[in-house]
């Protein structure tokens, strides 16, 4: 699939400084009516496109979590003016109050209909469809192969509650060797008020875009000369990453984990044993020849932890074993899907694996849930959406083991007191899992943490332990990631904070602003005191006027700006301006040191000083 190529669409955008309106935006996955509205709106759009552009051929057009899209094969690129015309035509179609009717047809009848319209993409879709074959008509002039569901009549679609948002390139079937299509994205809601709120949030999302903030705040970059999807951490971003990693390590040591460091490459035979070459080869970088052996970059850390476990004979008395690693992995991502820090080719997973006894599952899962909550809440993620995925039709492992594992996950979630949904049959073939999504400041949900039981790798590698009766038994293996990808989590976190990082996490916590050269020696004295106390502080050396250096500090989102003039130097004090708390007035250096050290130790968002 090709990357997004936004085409701006005129709309009355709300200012980003205004607070988000208290309008609850439903999700497609939670509202059957909204799903029908969006699915039907995609058909209305396709009908409008084919009326205005008779040579355009339709392919697929599903609903999404926030709207809908349709892929078209059209000789000419769609422009902003085209989108306006399409939207206008859609309004006319809605106003005609056309019925949407489901019709069941034979394969031959469907093929006859498609050939009459000369729609080769539909013929290819038809080849893959299982009977019964259904199509939906829109009035008596337009139809498409579709399983539904849809609204009964276009009068259920509000003419002022939809928008066409952008055009992107997309390959047919997501295959770069096939035809390149044009994907028109739209959004549709039940009311105009919901649409207005959606637009407001989109503007806010642009303000928070981690790619822009990463550049403006000098945190990271992706350099074309090095290659796509490879992250360069700049000093300010690297400082933040170190703080995150140090906290992560501390939390894991306190949670009973030991740390591992494992290689970045392995002999290709390891990936054969693990099954990655059978099931994951397309996402792996190709092999490299070294000393007549083939090696490949690791796409996952799991097999390395398995080998570490297998390096010696284990006893049931050792279990549970908890190992964690911040391990860099490498995965091939197509050019069109890479996106800032969210989708990259080299990234760090906060992987952990727990090897335990069957009767330890519930307790170990609960420990993981507690640790997950501790870590995520430290970064102000406190609202979660949790799914428990159970055994699919095709799976490995006995019914008894699956039942025991699923029961352990369920019990742990219930003991934790968290609400969760059950995705029947949604687990991996090798074990049930818990997926946790986090909600950010503007209501978006992000897939983050995963807890996955694995019956596959222990079997493939022949893992065992000596049980109390002297027999050898296979341990239960739990995969677990809290951040998922450290890079991706950093991007989500940056957007959640809009670059206004809490004091403890900010790469530069305090910037000293000497008003004149005469107070420079005093400013340097204060700087030394701050640095000695472990505070990340700098002095503005630009020589610009006070107003400009304050604006520069605000643009860099420095949590605390400390103005130093002759009065402050005489009083052994400083004047503080906090991004969170405003003007804090004149404060002694000693009070600042104590407040800053306390904020760092307790990982607080601000200094805690009163104006």
From Swiss-Prot:
It catalyses: tRNA(Thr) + L-threonine + ATP = L-threonyl-tRNA(Thr) + AMP + diphosphate + H(+). Pfam families: HGTP_anticodon, tRNA-synt_2b, tRNA_SAD. Binds 1 zinc ion per subunit. Its main location: cytoplasm. The keyword Cell membrane does not apply. Disulfide bonds: none annotated. Keywords: Aminoacyl-tRNA synthetase, ATP-binding, Cytoplasm, Ligase, Metal-binding, Nucleotide-binding, Protein biosynthesis, RNA-binding, tRNA-binding, Zinc. The keyword Cell inner membrane does not apply. Zn(2+) binds at residues 302, 353, 479. GO terms for biological process: threonyl-tRNA aminoacylation. HAMAP family: Thr_tRNA_synth. This is Threonine--tRNA ligase. It comes from Synechococcus sp. (strain CC9902). The gene is thrS.
